């Protein structure tokens, strides 16, 4: 997902900043540093700095935000399908989601666009609204948005399922198995808050508070609710985006068509997602695993469950947020 720049290939601003930041190793053995309360690899930190400095937001922009492995691919597909359904109905044989991975249609600021350039050419995003995505926490994102009133949709997920999916994804990503930590070691690091884009609880709370302070511009969604009540959740999402379903659309089955098109079952079965690759070389199939609620029960011991539950209870105390 990210280019592998050596430390000497980073610009001077980034190298100087890194030398002053707290650092640690993530569970793959990669050096990460803590900037504005969040852990980043050196490459991604440089991209975050580029984004904060150079991005020129438009008030019509839509940004999909998430902590890694919380349902980002699914939410990107839904966002694209909802916003483009008037010109590109979900039942069209040439719908872009049938031939493109959702991460191509909704690129990341810090992993795609600003990783490769300090000031990337965004003119190809000429249609309005422009669609972008990010894994950075809210306060870091807002610095790049410079007071814009664009809309942000955030997807959260139960911390235990997030951890399991996170470990599987980065284990598949890592080619040198000798430096992969065990699930138990990864669990301990995660509980300490040492994970790429972590700590998890700080990340989630940053967007939760944003949604309470400005519900017209920040929508906080939960993976579990989307799985349990897809029609209600997607209708609410469309309302937030400013493209609510008409009575005629609902009667014609448009909501269910979008649910089917964007389902993980359908997306993972597409040829582009079985054999295709992103520009980075990452295989599209890596973004699809189970997408289930409760898979953590196959991995966490009762002691692990109790420990992480106590941490989450403490970190989310008095916030009003529950999983």
Curated annotation (Swiss-Prot):
Principal location class: cytoplasm
SUPFAM superfamilies xrefs: P-loop containing nucleoside triphosphate hydrolases (SSF52540)
Any one Gene Ontology cellular component term annotated for this protein: cytoplasm
Tissues expressing this chain: Expressed in inflorescence stems, roots and siliques.
Annotated residues for binding of 3'-phosphoadenylyl sulfate: 69-74, 157, 165, 289-291
Gene Ontology biological-process entries: flavonoid metabolic process
pH dependence: Optimum pH is 7.5.
Functional summary from the UniProt entry: Sulfotransferase that utilizes 3'-phospho-5'-adenylyl sulfate (PAPS) as sulfonate donor to specifically catalyze the sulfate conjugation of flavones and flavonols. Strictly specific for the position 7. Substrate preference is kaempferol 3-sulfate > isorhamnetin > kaempferol.
The protein's name: Cytosolic sulfotransferase 5
Species the sequence originates in: Arabidopsis thaliana
